[in-house]
């Protein structure tokens, strides 16, 4: 029996740290660029919170704006992985509430089960 190991999913905070390093910005400089406080930036980097849709867009835009053409694909890939990590984290933290909302909205428990 072949067992394939799945890589451990990357955390949004780790990917944001890589983005910050590649942009060569301090925590304070990056928080200023994004219009958030240093405390919020540290919480994002520590994976304590996930960014809102608007902040997520601002981070990705800041990261992929004006890249060197030879690293554009790398930056797009990392931005995509960061977005996926945020989505996984959001789902992991809110799956029960999402499940309840689906049940309430659709009144079909079998739909709720298929989402999990």
Residue ranges: model-predicted function:
Residues 29-31:
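Short alpha-helical "recognition helix" segments of helix-turn-helix
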Residues 25, 36, 65-68:
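Short glycine/serine/threonine/alanine-rich loop segments
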Residues 34-51:
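Recognition helix of helix-turn-helix/homeodomain-like DNA-binding domains
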Residues 1-24, 57, 101, 105-108, ...:
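A short, Lys/Arg-rich alpha-helix, primarily the initiator
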Residues 60-77:
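Intrinsically disordered, low-complexity basic tails/linkers immediately adjacent to helix-turn-helix/homeobox/MYB/SANT
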Residues 47-61:
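Short, basic-rich loop-to-helix N-cap that marks the start of a DNA-contacting helix
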Residues 72-109, 113:
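Short, charged recognition helix plus adjacent turn
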């Amino acid at each position: 029996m072949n067992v394939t190991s799945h890589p451990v999913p990357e955390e949004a905070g780790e990917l944001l740290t890589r983005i910050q390093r590649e942009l060569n910005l301090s925590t304070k400089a990056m928080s200023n660029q994004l219009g958030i406080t240093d405390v919020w930036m540290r919480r994002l980097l520590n994976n304590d919170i996930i960014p809102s849709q608007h902040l997520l867009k601002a981070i990705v835009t800041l990261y992929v704006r004006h890249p060197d053409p030879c690293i554009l694909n790398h930056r797009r890939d990392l931005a995509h992985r960061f977005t996926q990590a945020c989505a996984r984290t959001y789902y992991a933290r809110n799956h029960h509430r999402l499940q309840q909302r689906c049940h309430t909205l659709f009144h079909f428990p079998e739909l709720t089960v298929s989402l999990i």
